[in-house]
Regions:
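Short, compositionally biased
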Residues: 36-42, 73-84, 135-159, 177-196
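P-loop NTPase nucleotide-binding/switch module
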Residues: 90-126, 130-133, 140-145, 162-223
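Conserved, well-folded catalytic cores of nucleic-acid-processing
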Residues: 3, 25, 38-41, 50-51, ...
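Short alpha-helix capping/helix-loop boundary micro-motifs
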Residues: 7-11, 43-49, 106-117, 151-155, ...
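Structural motif
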Residues: 21, 44, 59, 77-78, ...
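Short polar/acidic secondary-structure junctions
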Residues: 13-15, 27, 133, 145, ...
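N-terminal accessory targeting/assembly segments
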Residues: 1-89, 93-96
Length: 225
């Protein structure tokens, strides 16, 4: 119903949540946006790119979830923009309007090594196995969204798997089975609580550059705060 630069007012005909992702359709192009305010039947959305060409009456599709990122093998060795578009797979020097790419390669195979076994009791963020991503051991964890305790029914044998292949089957307290792959989604604005202790950085990372080490020292592992 209104367009001011990257801020668009949308008339909605259903439930809409704060920070929900939506797509504004402009011909064959879909522009990603985020709900920043809800006021009755109107939602104010902020578009992540140019709104040139968007007109009153364009259809808007709400996705029912917040801005999410995919977590899995390939994440640590890729370059992304702020929407987790893989820059290495995008064509040209500049990003095309409405162009989005898959953040992780679903066809690449990774050498999976199990660390859990059948019968283990696990909770969210417990390790099920790992893959080598470069020189780093990339831990494959119980999905962060899982609540309570689960029993490991089976874990895939060591070998090569794609990120969407099932590497473990977990059983909850109701006896329901859940297939777990090497990838999971998580909303970027929600803190991950799947940890017992959060260590604080305590050691200075010596860069050898005096102006950094003296005036702007950096802790190994980031700020941690």
């Amino acid at each position: 119903t209104g367009i001011i630069a990257n801020l668009i007012t949308v008339e909605v005909n259903g439930p809409v949540a704060q920070n929900e992702i939506c797509y504004i359709k402009e011909g064959n192009t879909r522009l990603m946006a985020e709900v920043i305010k809800v006021n009755g039947k109107n939602a104010s959305v902020q578009v992540y790119e140019s709104t040139r060409g968007v007109k009153k009456g364009n259809e808007v599709e709400f996705m029912g979830h917040m801005l999410e990122v995919m977590l899995g093998p390939g994440l640590l060795s890729s370059n992304y923009d702020g929407l987790q578009n893989n820059l290495a797979t995008m064509t040209g020097v500049f990003l095309e309007k409405g162009e989005y790419t898959a953040p992780l390669d679903t066809e690449k195979k990774w050498n999976f090594t199990p660390t859990a076994k059948a019968g283990d009791i696990v909770v969210a963020a417990d390790w099920l196995g790992e893959v080598k991503e470069g020189w780093l051991p990339h831990k494959i964890m119980v999905p962060f969204r899982f609540k309570g305790e689960y029993t490991v029914k089976s874990v895939a044998a060591a070998g090569e798997y794609k990120i969407n292949d099932t590497i473990a089957v977990l059983t909850d307290s109701q006896g329901e089975e859940h297939n777990v792959s090497m990838v999971q989604k998580w909303p970027v604005k929600v803190a991950i609580g799947g940890y017992i202790e959060k260590p604080r950085p305590y050691k200075i990372m010596e860069t050898g550059v005096r102006v950094i080490d003296t005036l702007n020292p950096i802790a190994e592992g980031g700020t941690g705060f």
